[in-house]
């Protein structure tokens, strides 16, 4: 089944997670997620953005950017409004990513639904930012040197860009120069996600 993903007004929290070394295609070793481009860090971020203690956060859209390995970049979207069949553990999320990595990468901007609430497309972070800008999402950067995010006023549509264990590369720094930078403190993370 293939359909084009359109962003609805009910989505409020947008996350872009950049995996600099995470392969966009090929094999993913579920027994060695840290050795697979730090996939462990990426799936933990997805898990935190998607799941509550009692269910799925239905107001979140997470875009995982796989930028490592051979071939073009891939974006995988997890849509909390329709997501089903994914458990809140690293191995389950990584298993979904592994299955997608075996598929050909669709053209940039055309998201193909793989399973309920999970889509993939070609493209990189600039494509995601362009989409968010069109949807009037306020874009912010998660940065250790930024302001505490708990001090931020929450807007209707907030977008947060975060990196894996690597800092933003020079290209990513250029596009993010005018974006507000925040960091999480102990309770800041829960406050923004609650």
Positions of PLM-derived features:
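Post-transcriptional modification and biogenesis factors for structured RNAs
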Residues: 1-194
